From Swiss-Prot:
It holds the Pfam family Herpes_glycop_H. Coiled coil: none annotated. This is Envelope glycoprotein H. It is a single-pass type I membrane protein. Residues 19-693 are virion surface. Residues 1-18 form the signal peptide. Residues 177-239 are annotated as: Interaction with gL. Glycans are attached at N43, N59, N80, N128, N444, N560, N613, N675. It comes from the Viruses. Belongs to the herpesviridae glycoprotein H family. N-glycosylated, O-glycosylated, and sialylated.
Amino acid sequence: MTILQLFLVFLNILEALCDYQLPKPRINKPPAEERLKLRNGYNTTLIEFDDGVQSFNLNWTKIIEHIPHDELIELWREANVTEPLVNTLLKRSDTYRPETNVHIPGHGNSYACALPYWSYTIDQWEDNKTTGYLGNFGIPSKTVLNEFFYDFQYVYTNRQFYTEATYVLNCLIGATTPAYPTISCHITPNYLFVSVEFTKFDSLTLLFGHSHYLPPLKGHIVYNDIEGASNDVFSLVIFSTYDLFGKHVESFKFDIAKVFREIIETPPLTFIKNLQDEMFTIEIRDGCNINNIVNPKTFLFAFKAVVAHFLVIDSLRTQQHILLNCFANYMSELEFLRKLMESCFEFFEFDFPYTVIETLAASQALNVPKHVITSLSHQDKTNMLSLFRLSRHSKHVSAVAISEIIDLISHIYTAYSYTYMLTSSERKMLLDAYIVLNDIMHKNETVKKQDLLPYVLSSSMCTSLEIGNLLLHFGQKDVLDVYETFSPCYLSLRFDFTKEKLITEFPQSSLIAQKEINLGTNGFFQTLHMRHHTSLEILPIIKCIKSLSTDIILSIPLKNITYVISTKPVPNSKIYDVSEVFLKTSMIISAVNNDCKPYQGGSAAHQIPVIYNVTVPRRGCPYCSSVVLSYDESQGFQSMMYITDTYVQENLFTEHSPFFGDGNLHIHYLILMNNGTVIEVRGAYRARLVNFIIVIMVFILFLVGLYLLYKLFVYLT
């Protein structure tokens, strides 16, 4: 054996032994007597190597005092010291090396949830009780960190580096049946790695972690060869082979330095939000077929999603206490990201426990004063909604959360009645409310009538204008914004969403290409059917309308009565048939008693009376708890507005109200009263339209007159 070969042998042994981490607990620990025999058998064994440049001395006595015999054998096997040098060189030459290795000075963005100077800390909480309700206090970082890293196990790394025993979180993306490709990920306290496994033996792995605490490599590679980017704290490394690169060249088409910059330079919540947008876009645009995993877009998304979780956990190591509401925001946004991934991929599993934060969030939610949310700042509203989201599975929180969410949506709805538009921050808060209500309402066996108000208000904000704007967004944006594309329609009690219906709602313009119409219609339709989880099951009258569930267009639960808009009448209800004015479809309005008691006035359809010139009432709110509904003679139901207070009433019936500003004589308006009475509204909105038509006709006649005078002048001259 040459000196070079001896040197490589001892180098491998030293590296394996020096970097070995002792598992807890030891596995297959030999009895004390056997260990004593082994120690006596090896206590004179010394291994020395000295080539004049470096010297190595291994004392078996010291080694076996700390490493059990069977594990020592496993170390020897994994070190593979008898491997021919030719094989080692071949593996080295076949190791894939990125074209560049970029170093970016600095530490990158901080994920730390630092405590403000005015905050306080809580190290223990008895009976899960805390003070305050916005999470403005610090909690021990170690308590949260210990919950994440509870599972001590071996980390197997597809032969890139030595097996390590450490704390680890695992995730897997793949198919419900054993198949390739799959994506596996592993998060440890110091690093993470994500692998796309093409076969049992071929994989592409990205590793990200603290530069000085990366796992020990095997002898044929060094980090300088495979590192793609780094800063003063973290490194990003790629593991693969040139042989695999040749087989899956498309999967390697990404800029590793650009990915690293995106990770370290994007603010934390923005980075997580961008990942939510990216996942949503992949789901709507590209689909979530398991074969798309080999696409670099999907693989890089999965890698960045795992990095986001790692960086949030890693922030716990930098401080003794963390601010609860700050960390709760991270947890709620990461949870939503995982929910998006779960709804997309055929098989998705991510071990990410957060019971400590969940428990503290519930304790804070239970302290929330009644009707306080609308008086809070935007950031405090966000903090409260994050606490509700994390604690929504606690049955004790349900009543508090629903009460505050009703106030919040009512506040948003009143502001909406002025402009008929929603801001990005309002859509985000509606999304938070949607997440909370979705879980709570479907778990409640009995639903109170007042708890249905968010669904009525959401139905009111799901107007033709809202649908048209969303169709444009889905049709024209390359990256879909998960907040901007969230619609009140997902919380509505509308059930008439078909592709044909959506096409009629698309804004009419010669500037809109057919491709945009197709993208918009398909995207919004797909999202509606994924996100619109509102069910008739939450309605108290479900037992008397269940047989007509497929015929229902809209349900409007009011305080004293529930209106059901459908293509067939609801038995034992007060019926208004408006089908005689339709050209293509039919629509029947049924007023159903909330206790499902039969209507005593007979089964014959009632005629809808007409009133004219509805104006804003000067005093009081006579239309409160009523609904104004619009429908088209050709396309059927269009929009509705529920009148909650005098502000909404005034905005609805004002002269410039967008609700009555369609300018289409084929659109009719009905008022559905809280006592079961339905009336048709005609008046100012039609008078304005008639006046507009008269002005147009006069203008046309004026132009014709000018033209005739011009022709006469030409003829005479």
